[in-house]
Amino acid sequence: MIDLVFPDGSSRQYPDGATGRDVAAAISKSLEKKALLIKLDGQVLDLDRRLTPDLLTGERKFEILTREAPEALDTIRHDTAHVLAEAVQELFPGTQVTIGPNVEDGFYYDFARDEPFSLDDLEKIEKRMKEIVDRDEKITREVWDRNEAIAHFDGIGEQYKAQIIRDLPDTDTITVYRQGNWKDLCRGPHLPSTKHVGKAFKLTKLAGAYWRGDQNNAQLQRIYGTAWASEADLEAHLKRIEEAEKRDHRKLGKTMDLFHIQEEGKGMVFWHPKGWALYRVLEDYMRRRLDAAGYKEVKTPQILDRSLWEKSGHAEKFGHAMFMCESAEGEVLAVKPMNCPGHIQIFNVGQKSYRELPLRMAEFGACHRYEPSGAMHGIMRVRAFTQDDAHIFCREEQVTEESARFIELLRSVYNDLGMTLADTKFSTRPELRAGTDETWDKAEAALAAAAEAAGETLTLQPGEGAFYGPKLEFSLKDAIGRVWQCGTLQLDFVLPERLDAEYVSEDGSKKRPVMLHRAILGSFERFIGILLENFAGALPVWLAPTQVVVATITSDADDYAREVVEKLTKLGMRAELDLRNEKINYKIREHSLAKVPVIAVVGRKEAETGQLALRRLGGEGQSVLSLEEALRVLKSDATPPDVARALAVQEAVTA
């Protein structure tokens, strides 16, 4: 008999060789009908998988998964990819299938076919997919002999599947899933039949790809799709996509005249005056926050000798993404992909005492990394970017306090920028790692304690830490519910060893500092893209590249409008003057499309009475204020939140 432990802690016995379906049926007929998968000791398995001794080596924690389970959605998406592949091969004989994994919110499948797919083809494929769902084809798992599997796929012209099997370790079990008469190499798990996939799916786009991501290999055609547990979920997702397209930072960058990227500088941002104004406002804000938090700003070289990157380990780990060149004198130089080795060089100049720690070193460091052309995306994924990078050199006993301080700073920055901290992931020791278990125990405990002290709930990611230390990853949720991973806190006890960083301890001995790598924005370019999409371009007044446009109704108000702009500029505001001989409604529409937060309308009446008519972006109507009151209101709106807090404290002290 088999003992299984259920989520409520109860234990029940079942006959040897029972399947998940047998267990569900023994509980209730209704559960048997709803059951799609099982989970045994954290592993998701087919509903009809027999519970054999090789699966029952753990605690035997058992769960029956229905359509509502998050794990079921992953399988629905993967099964939809299989239905897609079957539909393609039915409609386009001779097409080879390669791989079809899940991605965020959906899936893709790569196909080898000489003639490219068209958007019309997607409609035909989607229709055939729904027919396959209606057929209710049974899905079964089969274990095959390796050589027989290779011979089978070679025999039907599926060279990519045969190659995948050849490349698998000899110890791997070869499993093929049969879906009606169609077969595919797959580890599983899968749903019991195609009807359980449902019809809450949609094919979304076509793209090119290379076999195994290598541009030297054959080019493939990729079909992307999304799939959900219900039609309502699909509809909500499609609405989010529609909204995301409206907010696309690439479109906003053009309409707001912020930046562009061109063929001669792939992945390199050309910042226009307004875009650079936004960049500098964000940079100045971050500089003030870091200054107030006790960081010292530094600047390190863009190009360093390859030998330093070899010593640090980056040449080995990141060499494929580094830009290198050889000088006329034979030096091999590398453009820096990150700032940490340079910061250790500064730390190593002069003897450091334990009294000087923690030492918080910050740099708005321009970095360059090679990204394949197909992977780049606007200013969110580029080859040249600037990190809000900092490294904290501290003693072991200071790690928890410094980490907690950083988390508080990060949370405050996100709040100021109108973003919500959604999730904090905690990545622990991987199998391949440097350092002793005792060192890792201390490091993981320190980060966990810091997160707890800062009130953060952690999502555990076992084994996902870097080889040199555990890390925290901080994700934001934007206005339409998308999650963006931005901030990081990485504990490193390897790089100080590699680059010989040390300090004199209290007892006079020399010790290695612990190094905390940390970033809040991640990169300025990507974070500006996130801000633009979060606010749909309608940035808060303090961040907006142009804060106010003073637009005239008539030329009689030109002199007054110039006076207003001069006063706004003296207050430190980014103000523009629009004296064009155009109708005021045309001017308002144009500046609204450019996402200017405030338009100050002036005509003969406002000029004569010394007033301003303020129109807010997205608001209805306008408010008419005296010039003095309008300047006060606009100055208040344009004051960065950290400056406003400092002024409030100053006023409270002097009151």
Swiss-Prot record:
Tell me the protein's name: Threonine--tRNA ligase
Provide the reaction this enzyme catalyses. tRNA(Thr) + L-threonine + ATP = L-threonyl-tRNA(Thr) + AMP + diphosphate + H(+)
Q: Which note does the record give on the cofactor?
A: Binds 1 zinc ion per subunit.
Q: Which region ranges are annotated with the description Catalytic?
A: 248-540
Residues binding Zn(2+), per UniProt: C340, H391, H517
Entry-linked InterPro entries: aa-tRNA-synt_IIb, aa-tRNA-synth_II, aa-tRNA-synth_II/BPL/LPL, Anticodon-bd, Anticodon-bd_dom_sf, Beta-grasp_dom_sf, TGS, TGS-like
What biological processes does GO assign it? threonyl-tRNA aminoacylation
Q: What is its main location?
A: cytoplasm
Q: Which UniProt keywords apply?
A: Aminoacyl-tRNA synthetase, ATP-binding, Cytoplasm, Ligase, Metal-binding, Nucleotide-binding, Protein biosynthesis, RNA-binding, tRNA-binding, Zinc
**Species for this entry:** Caulobacter vibrioides (strain NA1000 / CB15N)
Query: Which Pfam family name is an example for this entry?
Result: TGS
